[in-house]
Amino acid sequence: MPNIRYTKDHEYIRPDPDGAVVGITDFAQSQLGDVVFVELPVIGAVLARGAEAAVVESVKAASGVNAPASGEVIEVNSALEEKPGLVNEDPNGSGWFFKLTLADPSELDALMDEEAYEAFIKTIA
């Protein structure tokens, strides 16, 4: 998927016309196992890059989801409150967590592209 950027903590950020969509990668959801609860950020929250923005809980563990870039939360995926398993079923699609405006789009340049992320996964898998 073009323009998607990744963190070493397995979050992705996908620019779109309204801002950028944030979620966790397929690798992350597979490591977590069955997701049973998601705590989403508050709309209007201003996040710094690297700050914890959400929490995902699975049958194995709870993990923070950090903001890959600075910005204001403009939308959350409320479907995850009713069906947190969407994170497992479609992490790059309907399992997204939140959308934010980008305070500084150049922050994305410091993140990995898909090729670099795939290489990174191979070093830890």
From Swiss-Prot:
One of its GO terms (biological process) is glycine decarboxylation via glycine cleavage system. Keywords: Lipoyl. It comes from the Bacteria. The modification N6-lipoyllysine is found at K60. Residues 19-101 form the Lipoyl-binding domain. GO terms for cellular component: cytosol; glycine cleavage complex. PROSITE patterns: BIOTINYL_LIPOYL (PS50968), LIPOYL (PS00189). Binds 1 lipoyl cofactor covalently. SUPFAM superfamilies: Single hybrid motif (SSF51230). Its cofactor is (R)-lipoate. The keyword Nucleotidyltransferase does not apply. The glycine cleavage system is composed of four proteins: P, T, L and H. Belongs to the GcvH family. The glycine cleavage system catalyzes the degradation of glycine. The H protein shuttles the methylamine group of glycine from the P protein to the T protein. This is Glycine cleavage system H protein.
